[in-house]
Amino acid sequence: MPEVIELFVVEHRAPYQFLPNNHQSKSDFIETSCTLACNHPVNCLLRTPMLDVVVLFFLFGLLAGLVRSELKLPPALYDTLSLFLLLAIGLKGGVGLAQQSLQPLLPQLALVILLGMLQTLAGFTVLRLKMSRVDAAATAAHYGSVSVATFAVGVNWLTERGISFESQLSIFLAVMEIPAILVGIVLAQGVSRQTRWRRLAHETFLGKGVTLLLGGMAIGYLAGPDGIAPLKPLFVDLFKGALALFLLEMGLIVARQCQDLRRHGLFLLGFALLMPLASAGLGLMIGQLMGLSLGGLTLLATLAASASYIAVPATMRIAVPQANPGLSLSAVLGVTFPFNIMLGIPLYHSWARHFTE
């Protein structure tokens, strides 16, 4: 009578029973059977993390904020992490640009500027159904612009899976901040003599985010891969840890915005969920015109789907002070940002795969 070997599978109270054939040794059989048991669908589900670890940090911060924990990061640390992430992204993009011709970049920049303008106009058209002109314009500008944190999570998501992407995406990140802001201002109040264009230009083109990104790219481009190599332990190896801490603080911030979102109704909630999906689709079409790779398409869709919560609010406070910042920030931070980093990026990647097949 053949020997019965019992292997326990976690989701069953009773053991599975396997019968080895006459051509397998006991050790070979056990190795094969363990592989089969570990590859059981339920076991795979249990062993495979559904969310990236940095997203779990975000969820931890969100939960801590919702239960009104006293957890908080020092403001100086949050600012330092922002600076670090922007520089790291800029350096990586600059090194990539140093290894390719810059001439094909000009038509691509024109396309991403067009993308930001179209998103802002489309968002304004929808929001105008329920909002005042200035609130609709200010909120639309947030959704026509981009989020560095969402981009950083997208970069990490692709890197973890060994998916390459074009280096010029870092330049797109810097450039896409600008057209949405300018279009949003014009939609809100037109071209007026009262508009403080010099101050707005300084805030738009020389804001912290754009300056750090462009500065990092310039350093990476001039230094090249060999020059940046000594900085790898800081800007490459520590990138994921810095992103995790940054997202922990973002979770705490989002928890506060979730409470504000309840006051603004289902219309804003629906817009905050559907606008990223429509923008991602538009981004994929633009990316296909550029001839981007699978990773590049995924990142451009992620950029298009993201919404600004730093550069645009700061500029709109100057240009359109009568707009209600609570409307846009509660939608961006309470809905769009968590949706993108938890569900959106894998979804946009699956859409991008269909575009490349």
Which residues make up each language-model segment?
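Compositionally biased, low-complexity intrinsically disordered regions
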Residues: 4-5, 25, 37
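Membrane-helix boundary/juxtamembrane motif in polytopic membrane proteins
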Residues: 261-270
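Extreme N-terminal basic, low-complexity initiation segments
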Residues: 2-12
